[in-house]
Amino acid sequence: GGCSSEWGFSEGSQPLGIFRPVVLEATDEIRIEPFGVHIWNDEKAANVFVETEVKNYGKTTETIEVVNKLSNADGKQVFRLVEKVTLAPGEMKVIRQQSPVENPVLWDTENPYLYKLASMIKRDTKTTDEISTPFGIRTISWPVKRNDEDGRFYLNGKPVFINGVCEYEHQFGQSHAFSREQVAARVKQIRAAGFNAFRDAHQPHHLDYQKYWDEEGVLFWTQLSAHVWYDTPEFRENFKKLLRQWVKERRNSPSVVIWGLQNESTLPREFAQECSEIIREMDPTARTMRIITTCNGGEGTDWNVIQNWSGTYGGDVTKYGKELSQKNQLLNGE
């Protein structure tokens, strides 16, 4: 929270410095950019789209091949897309490719089926860079994107009851400095409790979480921020910079079904609308499938989701079930 009106360490503060593992990788001078592979499917699960960011860090113009190969869980090739690209020194290009897919196995909470996309750069037939991206084909539908009276959430055309949990990424004595083993332990606890959905309250968690949610079939409501707002040009630009990084790191995950822009939002409507449009530009499925939310306050997104604390911060726990059946509580953030 810094010097803002943010209340409480658990809600808004994030540590500074290095608090997660860091890896140094040596690459070829022409490489796929970090988080530079974007893969998604359309709302009919009939076509797959791939974008690959490649950049030439060398001093000479080079011609390469960009190859994207999708394989099923058994390793059988589904499609292979190839495009020749010429890059001047310092030049970055986004390579856009697409392919139909016939009778795909769909990712869901009961069978979280994952394909694998291998993205490669080839120079003189030699593979000089390669990135592997797990990918699940699925469709989702929210009531706020439909013009009907049905208040249910649909996954692959079937209604799914969302039974989720929020988690603060804090470890006693370690703050946010989770090891991979500690993330895995949290995941096991959440699954053992019977939850099928997760909200990372209220800032982006360790990326290993979404890896597990993809593999375990857990629906993911990812969060960017909580409460904070400064009406300065510097804050606006930095917020949008962090927003783009957040989306880029998470948009390939089939488990992600909600983009949570801010918890108990203090963002002005027009700024939230601007941020929502950035999300939709970076993630086309946010126009047709995924939703963008604030929670317990806020304007400018697809849905301001209510929070209900009956029996905790106040209210009557015996009325909780009845309250959740109300139309304005189809989805509840806490």
Annotate each PLM feature.
Residues 1-207, 212-213, 217-220, 242, ...:
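Secreted/periplasmic carbohydrate-active enzymes, especially glycoside hydrolases
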Residues 175, 184-190, 196-334:
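Substrate-binding/catalytic cleft of secreted carbohydrate-active enzymes
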